[in-house]
Regions:
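Beta-strand/loop-dominated core regions that host nucleotide or nucleotide-derived cofactor-binding catalytic loops
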Residues: 2, 55-59, 63-74
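Short beta-strand/strand-turn micro-motif
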Residues: 1-56
């Protein structure tokens, strides 16, 4: 399980994660949390080259609860 980053913002349709390093995961990468629960999939990468932001389409549920959670690649 590779640590990808932390969710910093969330709306009902998209969450934004900040990458923990300079490695950019592939679009479509499925993300899980520390409990191995599905979080969503990466649909876009934007921002600085160092620690870019990742747009994530959530798998459902209360997306506000995702803020502050660490996410990992499945």
């Amino acid at each position: 399980m590779k640590r990808i980053g932390e969710i910093v913002r969330a709306t009902s349709t998209v969450a934004v994660a900040r990458s923990t390093d300079d490695t950019v995961p592939d679009l479509g990468t499925a993300l899980i949390d520390e409990n191995l629960d599905d979080v969503g999939s990466i649909v876009d990468v934007f921002g600085p080259i160092e620690r870019p932001y990742l747009a994530v389409i959530p798998d459902g549920g209360n997306t506000a609860q995702l803020v502050g959670r660490t996410v990992y690649a499945r």
